């Protein structure tokens, strides 16, 4: 196949022949994800089929820029806190597909609503895992562009939280950092993105900060909304996290607010800095921390 692919390209995937679809698809903004079983190997995987029209619309935004595809970006990562991509390509009906490891858990967004007790005493572990995952993305030279609870997935035993979905990701360089492409999840979007200014990896740090704020409080720093207008207030200071968690560890609170600084020049510069700031924080609240001493 390697010899032929040099001349004819990678063979297209007839995914319904290769995989047994075990669970109905979970529909996202631009794709459907199935739990699937490889008919030959028996391996259980997550099979992501991208919507043809929505993918084409996104590619038009980057026309002429040679933006790498989601699969090309995702397969570069071999990290314990990033969902592993096994292969990617095009199906026989000309849709992009990505085969990933199957985690068996649910998204952080669902846990925040329905299963808060699962995180009791473990939030700092999850915060560090997500921070290290994002650090790895930035060190590879990419901006994720859609850090939010929906894109952080638990393993089935809830021991590990992994980053996924590189559908909006771009290289951290021009022309991808120039103003004009306003994509992401509004409640977590950085103000420079909303206001169509130059961007870089720090827009992810803002989104990460909002996500961790919500992980600790079940609230957002700004009023929640359902459309692009939700992000228009993000260039104003957010509500102090102590309004919702008076007992939160002061070092953690300071690190979170450093991430959600509206002025990009005053924002946490990288995930290594955030990780250093929380290095000695064992629990998210002051009482548990005091008990440990």
Question: What residues fall within each predicted segment?
Answer:
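Short beta-strand micro-motifs within the conserved protein kinase catalytic domain, predominantly
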Residues: 84-96
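Activation segment signature within eukaryotic-like protein kinase domains
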Residues: 126-127
């Amino acid at each position: 196949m390697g010899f032929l692919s040099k001349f004819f390209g990678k063979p297209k995937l007839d995914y319904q022949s290769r995989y047994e679809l075990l669970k109905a698809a979970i529909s996202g903004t631009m794709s459907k994800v199935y739990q699937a079983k490889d008919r030959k190997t028996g391996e259980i995987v997550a099979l992501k089929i991208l919507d043809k029209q929505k993918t084409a619309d996104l590619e038009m935004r980057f026309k002429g820029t040679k933006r790498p595809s989601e699969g090309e970006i995702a397969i570069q990562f071999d990290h314990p806190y990033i969902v592993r991509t096994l292969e990617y390509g095009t199906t026989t009906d000309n849709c992009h597909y990505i085969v990933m490891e199957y985690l068996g858990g649910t998204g952080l967004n669902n846990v925040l609503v329905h299963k808060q007790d699962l995180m009791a005493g473990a939030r700092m572990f999850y915060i560090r895992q997500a921070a290290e995952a994002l650090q790895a993305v930035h060190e590879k030279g990419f901006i994720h562009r859609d850090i939010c609870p929906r894109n952080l997935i638990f393993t089935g035993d809830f021991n590990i939280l992994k980053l996924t979905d590189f559908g909006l990701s771009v290289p951290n360089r021009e022309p991808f950092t120039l103003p004009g492409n306003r994509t992401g999840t509004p409640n977590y979007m950085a103000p420079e993105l909303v206001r169509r200014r130059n961007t870089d990896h720090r827009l992810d740090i803002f989104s990460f900060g909002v996500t961790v704020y919500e992980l600790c409080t079940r609230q957002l720093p700004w009023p929640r909304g359902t459309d692009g207008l939700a992000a228009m207030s993000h260039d104003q200071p957010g509500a102090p996290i102590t309004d919702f968690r008076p007992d939160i560890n002061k070092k953690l609170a300071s690190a979170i607010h450093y991430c959600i600084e509206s002025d990009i020049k005053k924002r946490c510069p990288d995930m290594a800095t955030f990780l250093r700031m929380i290095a000695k924080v064992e629990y998210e609240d002051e009482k548990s921390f005091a008990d440990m001493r």
